[in-house]
């Protein structure tokens, strides 16, 4: 099984630890960055993870930022992604078994590493349990999606990053 993983600069070390854990369990890890602690933007990495999952390049995805809120919101904008921000086993299992979630999001500064590993492993091993009710619910979720061709462009963030590099944005 191939697992896509991505993070922002705040939790690079957490992502690397999760990546090593997944590899130790025999999973193929597709690491979409970031790879260091240089200030960057979580939507870039959420988008990359989501696109890898939806395209079939990866079977499932894991997104991590400081609280998990930002990157999870970003990955959920990719049409076809159903991601859940979780901090506990019950939420992760519900997301996979009832909503057929294909990405899981974490706050790397919120959820401890060992718990995160346990939750990820349970999420991967859980199976979607289709019922007429949850099939209808998933169809309603998918109906909300709208595709924006502009965002599908690989250069979507280029202008933003060029402005950042020129110092036009500040924290």
Curated annotation (Swiss-Prot):
GO molecular function: galactose-6-phosphate isomerase activity; ribose-5-phosphate isomerase activity
Keyword Nucleotide-binding: no
Signal peptide: none
Domain of life of the organism encoding this protein: Bacteria
Protein name in UniProt: Galactose-6-phosphate isomerase subunit LacB
Species annotation: Lactococcus lactis subsp. lactis (Streptococcus lactis)
Pathway: Carbohydrate metabolism; D-galactose 6-phosphate degradation; D-tagatose 6-phosphate from D-galactose 6-phosphate: step 1/1
Gene that encodes the chain: lacB
InterPro entries named in the record: LacB, RpiB_LacA_LacB, RpiB_LacA_LacB_sf
Keywords, sorted A to Z: Isomerase, Lactose metabolism, Plasmid
Listed EC numbers: 5.3.1.26
Other known facts: This gene was sequenced from pMG820, a laboratory-derived deletion of the naturally occurring plasmid pLP712.
Highest classification ranks of the organism: Bacteria, Bacillati, Bacillota, Bacilli, Lactobacillales
Catalytic reactions on record: aldehydo-D-galactose 6-phosphate = keto-D-tagatose 6-phosphate
Family: Belongs to the LacAB/RpiB family.
Keyword match Isomerase: yes
Description of what induces expression: By lactose. The operon consists of lacABCDFEGX.
Subunit (UniProt): Heteromultimeric protein consisting of LacA and LacB.
GO BP term (any one): galactose catabolic process
Any single Pfam family the record assigns to this protein: LacAB_rpiB
């Amino acid at each position: 099984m191939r697992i896509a993983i991505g993070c922002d600069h705040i939790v690079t070390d957490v992502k690397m630890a999760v990546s090593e854990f997944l590899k130790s369990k025999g999973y193929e890890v597709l690491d979409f960055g970031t790879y260091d602690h240089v200030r960057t933007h979580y939507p870039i990495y959420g988008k990359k993870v989501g696109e890898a999952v939806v395209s079939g390049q990866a079977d499932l995805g894991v997104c991590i930022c400081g609280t998990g809120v930002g990157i999870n919101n970003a990955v959920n904008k990719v049409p076809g992604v159903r991601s859940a921000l979780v901090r506990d086993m019950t939420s992760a299992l519900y997301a996979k078994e009832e909503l057929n979630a294909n990405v899981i999001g974490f706050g790397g500064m919120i959820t401890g590493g060992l718990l995160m590993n346990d939750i990820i492993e349970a999420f991967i091993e859980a199976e979607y349990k289709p019922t007429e009710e949850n099939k209808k619910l998933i169809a309603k979720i998918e109906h909300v999606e709208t595709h924006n061709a502009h965002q599908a462009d690989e250069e979507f963030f280029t202008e933003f990053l060029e402005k950042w590099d020129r110092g036009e944005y500040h924290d």
